[in-house]
Amino acid sequence: MNINRSRLINNFIFISILVFFDQWSKYLVVKYIRIGTEYLSFFGDFFKIIHVRNTGVLFSIGSNIDPSLKNLFFLIIPIIILIFVFSFALKETNRIARIALVLILSGGIGNIIDRFFRPLGVVDFLDVKFFGIFGLQRWPTFNFADSYVVIGITLFIIYDLFAKNQSTNL
């Protein structure tokens, strides 16, 4: 098996596992926790599991825009971006960059699945205290797909700033 085919298979397996975990966690939240209900709290109120829906994007931005525009901004454009990221990931030779891109793809796919199949919005359920940093007492509620995207982007920025000029096979 050539390296590109092996890389494609590995990426597909990794993406499938992450998307499955994201969707499974959302399924459990939808099945067992009513919308707007806090289910568990850990370490006082530092970390909570609460079922909310997000009809916008990051931090609920755009949740009030016209529904006819939501398909364009929250489905079509993200799908085009994911196709670009996927093609970039297939060509990338650096392992760190590939992992970052696969994380971004996994998160994007997980949230796009919600947009297609959950008319009430993307399922968010992880709620973390933020101690007033940036004026936020609590970080906006998120899900595993959101985490994949943030970790992937952070990892890619670190790679781009520090490791890009190093060997391509870190």
Curated annotation (Swiss-Prot):
Matching InterPro entries: Peptidase_A8
Domain of life: Bacteria
UniProt subcellular location: Cell inner membrane
GO molecular function (one): aspartic-type endopeptidase activity
EC number: 3.4.23.36
Keywords carried by this UniProt record: Aspartyl protease, Cell inner membrane, Cell membrane, Hydrolase, Membrane, Protease, Transmembrane, Transmembrane helix
Membrane topology term: Multi-pass membrane protein
Cell inner membrane found in the keyword field: yes
Catalysed reaction, written as an equation: Release of signal peptides from bacterial membrane prolipoproteins. Hydrolyzes -Xaa-Yaa-Zaa-|-(S,diacylglyceryl)Cys-, in which Xaa is hydrophobic (preferably Leu), and Yaa (Ala or Ser) and Zaa (Gly or Ala) have small, neutral side chains
Active site: 124, 146
Residue ranges crossing the lipid bilayer per the database entry: 13-33, 72-92, 96-113, 142-162
Top-rank EC class of the record's enzyme: hydrolase
Any one Gene Ontology BP term: proteolysis
GO cellular component: plasma membrane
Pathway named in the protein's UniProt entry: Protein modification; lipoprotein biosynthesis (signal peptide cleavage)
Family: Belongs to the peptidase A8 family.
Function: This protein specifically catalyzes the removal of signal peptides from prolipoproteins.
Name recorded for this polypeptide: Lipoprotein signal peptidase
Lineage: Bacteria, Pseudomonadati, Spirochaetota, Spirochaetia, Spirochaetales
